Design a protein with these regions (language model features):
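Feature captures the catalytic cores and cofactor-binding loops of soluble hydro-lyases/lyases
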Residues: 168
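An N-terminally biased module of ancient metal coordination in phosphate/nucleic-acid-related enzymes
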Residues: 1-76, 153
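Active-site neighborhood of phospho(di)ester-bond hydrolases with catalytic His/Asp-centered motifs
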Residues: 8-10, 43-47, 79-83, 138-139, ...
Length: 168
């Protein structure tokens, strides 16, 4: 049994040269090493969604990141997803595979506007049946707030962001 908690990072901008994540392969390597040192054993690369995204390019970059981790001796599982800013057609994009869920699961990382309250989120996502949502907000203090449970007794839980990955 290990003394260290093994974690899954479900929101990582580790693909080099994509959006606001790692700028190059060297930076990606440093992020992988920092994640490994903190007990992360599975990283879901989540570049920002765009209607113009080249899915094949994302898959090739994911394969490259997996190979880089292997060369560094890091037994990291690397999966693909997307950070999805809510828009009306998003459920259709998910159903058609034009937007990615987290690691090909039924879960999606969906961002709503900071001012959107729970009722707005519930109204916008209420029809989704095949995909569960992880709506979140990034606060100025670096805290993600995820909707933990839907329904009248819903509550929000704050999760600290992997701080050393922010600094890397």
């Amino acid at each position: 049994m290990t003394d260290q908690l093994e974690m899954i990072d479900i929101h990582a901008h580790i693909l080099p040269g994509i959006d606001d994540g790692a700028r190059n392969w060297e930076e990606t390597g440093r992020l992988l090493e920092a994640a490994w040192a903190q007990g992360v054993r599975h990283i879901i690369a989540t570049p920002h969604f765009s209607r113009k995204t080249d899915m094949e390019q994302l898959r090739q970059l994911k394969a490259g990141v997996r190979e880089l981790a292997h060369r560094k001796g890091l037994e990291l599982e690397i999966s693909l997803g997307q950070e999805l800013r809510y828009f009306e057609e998003l459920p259709l994009y998910l159903e058609q595979g034009r937007a990615l869920t987290l690691a090909e699961s039924r879960y999606a990382l969906v961002e709503f506007k900071p001012g959107d309250g729970f009722q707005t989120i519930r109204r916008q996502s209420g029809n989704w049946s095949s995909t569960d949502l992880f709506p979140y907000w990034l606060t100025q203090s670096g805290i993600f707030a995820f909707v933990k449970q839907a329904g009248p007794r819903s509550w929000f839980r704050a999760e600290p962001v992997c701080r050393s990955m922010q600094k890397a």
